[in-house]
Amino acid sequence: MRDQYQRKIDYVRISITDRCNLRCTYCMPGEEVDFIHHEKLLSTEEILKIVKAFEELGVTKVKITGGEPLVRKDIIELIASIKKMAGIQEVSITTNGVLLEKMIDDLEQAGLDSINISLDTLKPAQYALMTRRNQFDIVMRGIQCAIKSSIPKVKLNCVLIKEINGDEILDLVELAHQTRVHVRFIELMPIGYAKNLTPISEDEVLDLLSKHYEGVKPFEGKLGNGPAHYYEIEGFLGKVGFISAMSHRFCSTCN
């Protein structure tokens, strides 16, 4: 399948719920959130029918997102059923990690290929401030479970905000140094609830990395299906990636 710009479309993202067990300040207004009623959400059968239609159009990779996808009771069934479709090569999810510790075994058995975990800070107090929940320890345990699992790719998504975690960049990068995790920095889009916050650009981060580490160079391989691009650093087990919607336009590479 190709779009009007002749880009090959082989990847689909499906949001299976708007519900979330965190209340991140740049994402939600607070506690009073008007969620979609359950009966108006796509059912298990409807989601699988949609994925099957995309598969027939040439889509080979499926990303399951939310909200928080792990709060749906049918998430394991969905992953396992999609993995059984002959044309689907990869199924991945994006999660905040709160439920990972208790669900990692089921996710492995369902055949999950890749997992993206949102983590914007390594400071428990700052985490509580950003998410309005005290779940830092359980998320960190979930990340360790993912690292130890047989799931092939584990990535951390970090939204950089100058006022909040601008002093933690190197600490977050160290996670890719010591473990197989790929750390991805996502540029904040200062709109909506985040309009008064200050983003940190890819160039600022690269400048910091080049001053602190030797052997920082673009990674020539491919680690995912979206617009992220990666750098490898000498001695690192994981890679450092960027999704730079503000400072580096990536529309031409979107699939």
Feature locations, PLM:
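Radical SAM/AdoMet-radical enzyme domain recognition
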Residues: T44-I64, R72-H182
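Accessory C-terminal segments flanking Radical SAM cores
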Residues: G192-N255
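Glycine-rich beta-alpha junction loops
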Residues: L160-I164, M189-G192, M246
